[in-house]
């Protein structure tokens, strides 16, 4: 499985923050530089390169682009430092990658959100500390209606239901995740409610 211990030199050199702002611990470089380094890592182990890319581009980048300062301090800074691993969960068993066909939903409950649904093929799903989750907040709105949440893995109602075994890239874990009445704080919303 992808684990941060495999890339200790990358952590030491700050490579998990190549394209992130220096004020969050990043190096402030461009995506081309990040891609070159990912390509070089992929020459030795494509699975680990995939895990790193999932963490940086799918788990951390949405927070850098759309997160509040508090979310950036809580998730982005430790993700760049290698203290947390992030993941992204959009794909679902009966929807594939068609985001409009997802069933996962989040319903407001006072100052909280109640998240229910199943996600699959989630890279870093086993080893992550948090997941960026797409869920319907307004099923009636066919144009928008999907909001994004940062979900801590240790919340009650969040379960890694299974690790998906695959033929290649075995060092990159892929999982199915289940959210059953998972109560999220109001500040779990990433960006604006759709």
Go through each PLM region and give its residues.
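Short Ser/Thr-interspersed hydrophobic loop/turn segments at strand-loop and sheet-helix junctions
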Residues: 14, 38-42, 135, 151-156, ...
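A short core secondary-structure module
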Residues: 112, 116-160
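A glycine-rich, basic-preceded beta-loop-alpha segment at the flavin cofactor/substrate interface
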Residues: 33, 153-164, 173-194
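A short, Trp-centered hydrophobic/proline-enriched beta-strand micro-motif
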Residues: 82-90
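Internal helix-loop-helix
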Residues: 12-83, 123-130
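A structural signal for short hydrophobic beta-strand segments in well-ordered beta-sheet cores
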Residues: 104-107
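Structural signature of FAD isoalloxazine-binding scaffolds in flavoprotein oxidoreductases
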Residues: 28-38, 98-102, 178, 184
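Short Gly/Pro-enriched turn/cap motifs at secondary-structure boundaries
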Residues: 79, 94-97, 121-124, 137-140, ...
């Amino acid at each position: 499985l992808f684990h941060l211990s495999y890339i200790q030199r990358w952590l030491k050199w700050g490579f998990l923050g190549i394209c992130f702002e220096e004020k969050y611990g990043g190096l402030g470089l461009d995506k081309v530089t990040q891609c070159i380094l990912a390509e070089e890592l992929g020459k030795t182990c494509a699975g680990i390169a995939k895990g790193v890319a999932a963490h940086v581009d799918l788990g951390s980048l949405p927070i850098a682009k759309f997160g509040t300062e508090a979310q950036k301090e809580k998730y982005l800074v430790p993700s760049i430092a290698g203290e947390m691993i992030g993941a992204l969960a959009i794909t679902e068993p009966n929807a594939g990658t068609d985001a409009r066909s997802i069933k996962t939903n989040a319903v407001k409950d006072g100052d909280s959100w109640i998240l229910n649904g199943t996600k699959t093929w989630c890279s870093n799903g086993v080893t992550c500390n948090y997941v960026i989750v797409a869920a319907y907040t307004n099923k009636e709105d066919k144009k928008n209606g999907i909001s994004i949440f940062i979900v801590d893995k240790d919340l009650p109602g969040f379960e890694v239901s299974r690790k998906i075994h695959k033929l290649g890239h075995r060092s990159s874990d892929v999982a199915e995740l289940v959210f059953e009445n998972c109560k999220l704080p109001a500040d779990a919303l990433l960006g604006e409610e759709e």
